[in-house]
Amino acid sequence: MEDAFRATVEEAIEERRQKLHQLSRFLWENPELALEEVKAHNYLTDFLESEGFSVQRNYLLPTAFRAEYRGKAEPGTNVCPTVAVLCEYDALPDIGHACGHNLIAECSVAAGIAIKEALCKYSTLPGRVVVLGTPAEENSGGKELLIRKGAFKDVHVAMMAHPGKRTGLKYAFTATLQLTVRFFGRTAHAGSSPWDGVNAGDAAVIAYMNISLLRQQLKPTWRVSGKSISARRPSVYLMTSGPLKGRSRTP
């Protein structure tokens, strides 16, 4: 039976090879930032609808979507085992799809179609497949927003693929927490009475340095990064420039 499933999956994807490649190229050539993925949303939902999925556009978020194909329920129940394939499609500022979200979208759509074809061919197989469009992965935490809005409440298994240097299966992931920290001080004239002030910039620099020094005690799977709040790129990327502005007064 496993060989038959594999053959069905391979055939479904091979038949659509060119269309799937065109999907990836379209996203590559039309990069859109987090929560602005209008072209990607429209292309992907039209594509999945043409493949027989029931599509909810603008699902819980303006550029999210849910494309579903439902097979039969478990015998004697109304429960339908549900697999969600997560589809990412937002790009990065300045460098477009350097993180490969065009490929993630292609893989997710291909996987969703392959599962749908298996459910169609093997009608006794219970199950439902959902291709869930999850915008804003690079910034704004799109999946977290969807979780909070209940997008995963009827999902039993969620999976996705990410391009990398090697092929492998990863079943555990690191959680992420994004913080914005602001330091507040008290202003004073730096030339005539600096002792009357409290420099919030000093506090920010010391905090950054202490966190950086802490890295030598962090385990290899732990990551901490930061950026200036004026930097354009997300904090997960190292800063390529670090502007400082100051003044020197000497006799």
Please describe what each predicted stretch is.
Residues 2-129:
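Acidic/His- and Gly-rich active-site-bordering loop/insert found
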Residues 65-66, 73, 90-98, 102-103, ...:
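Histidine/acidic-residue-rich, glycine-tolerant segments that coordinate divalent metal ions
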